[in-house]
Amino acid sequence: MRATRSHDEREFTFDERDFRRVCRMIRDRAGIHLHPHKRDMVYSRLARRVRALGMEKFGDYLDHVETDPDAELQGFINALTTNLTSFFRESHHFDALAEHLRTRGRDGVRIWCNAASTGEEPYSLAITACEAFGTMTPPVRILATDIDTNVLHTAARGVYPVERVNTLSLQRRRQFFQRGSGANAGLCRVKPELQAMIEFRPLNLLSEDYGLRGGFDAVFCRNVMIYFDKATQYEVLQRVVPLIAPDGLFFAGHSESFGHAHDLITPCGRTTYRPASGVRA
């Protein structure tokens, strides 16, 4: 069994003061609240950045993030964000979306996926749109955003290990993916028609102005709010909900609930919401 280093044997000194400082910085810049039991995870992820920059102390690294944010703030955020995802995760949402899309007609449907991660969710949305409209070129545009620029790069490429795609039915794999061969054996790429439907863009949900046009027919904001406290959740919803069409849908994660924001969104299904009456951009 491979031995692991104890706290005293760590490559870099990382004390409680450093951890509290990291917690404050990631909360202020990304809204993420880190629990005390995440201390070892924080060390492991940020130690890679300290090492990559040739620094010797965590304090020096955190000083660098704060004094030169253009150089390292994004690297700091990327290291601490969690990107657990899969194709058609929480599949009932995609069934509900398909029904919703069929009611929208062919006038141009807009969907916002605001935790795109490595792309499985926005591509699942694109597949759902193709199936709902019965064509590889449905009248649907998808905006896929994430605070982590590294995962957005992976998402835009649309290339995945076969094991990641094998959770899909054989019909979906054949219709929506191209299997690699030779040097690309063991990989699959989403078909160009899916990529053409999606715009990938970095976005921080804590930003005061997202710079987005409203009227989204559906917004997927799943398993993001669990990292925010209730006050931050409400602030984010104040910005997001007015961007949804009055009869549009807001999809949340299975462990997220928003009773404290009943004036903004109203439940209409399993972790599915509509804008509350009177909410406008």
Task: Please place each PLM-identified region on the residue numbering.
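Conserved AdoMet
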Residues: 1-112, 251-253
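A structural alpha-helix within SAM-dependent methyltransferase catalytic domains
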Residues: 98-102, 126-131, 241
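Short conserved AdoMet
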Residues: 106, 160, 245
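Conserved class I S-adenosyl-L-methionine
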Residues: 107-119, 141-143
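Conserved SAM-binding loop of SAM-dependent methyltransferases across substrates and taxa
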Residues: 118-135
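Extended basic-aromatic, gly/pro-enriched interface segments that bind polyanionic ligands
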Residues: 135-220, 224-235, 257-259
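Core SAM-dependent methyltransferase catalytic element
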Residues: 218, 259-281
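A short glycine-rich, Lys/Arg-flanked "PGG" loop and its adjoining helix->strand segment in the class I
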Residues: 234-246
